[in-house]
Amino acid sequence: MYAIIETGGKQFRVEEGLELNVQKMDAEAGTKVDLDKILLIGQGEDVKIGAPYVEGAKVSCTVVEHGRDKKIVVFKKRRRKDSQTKQGHRQDYTRIKVEAIQA
């Protein structure tokens, strides 16, 4: 069974036992989180599509850890103007593990 969930403004395809990084959540490591914004649930040929979300469906997850991604460099240069800026950014994330998908 798989599901397409929405969290942090992004969509993810998840299955039971999968670990993935999502945008930072306000939950301690080791706690259980229920995600209820389920866009689609599928199992073989049987597919339920929400409008916009599937009624009564939820995905149970466990928060594994919090962390920060690799640094990206934002470099802007204006040619012939002797002007340039360099800035770094590290995005916070939460690593979750999908425990169960309930239709």
From Swiss-Prot:
UniProt xrefs under Pfam families: Ribosomal_L21p (PF00829)
MF terms (GO), sorted A to Z: rRNA binding; structural constituent of ribosome
GO CC aspect terms: cytoplasm; ribonucleoprotein complex; ribosome
GO BP annotations listed: translation
UniProt keywords, alphabetically: Ribonucleoprotein, Ribosomal protein, RNA-binding, rRNA-binding
Alphabetized HAMAP family for the sequence: Ribosomal_bL21 (MF_01363)
Family per record: Belongs to the bacterial ribosomal protein bL21 family.
Subunit structure, as described in the record: Part of the 50S ribosomal subunit. Contacts protein L20.
Function description: This protein binds to 23S rRNA in the presence of protein L20.
Protein name per Swiss-Prot or TrEMBL: Large ribosomal subunit protein bL21
Organism: Maridesulfovibrio salexigens (strain ATCC 14822 / DSM 2638 / NCIMB 8403 / VKM B-1763) (Desulfovibrio salexigens)
Recorded name of the encoding gene: rplU
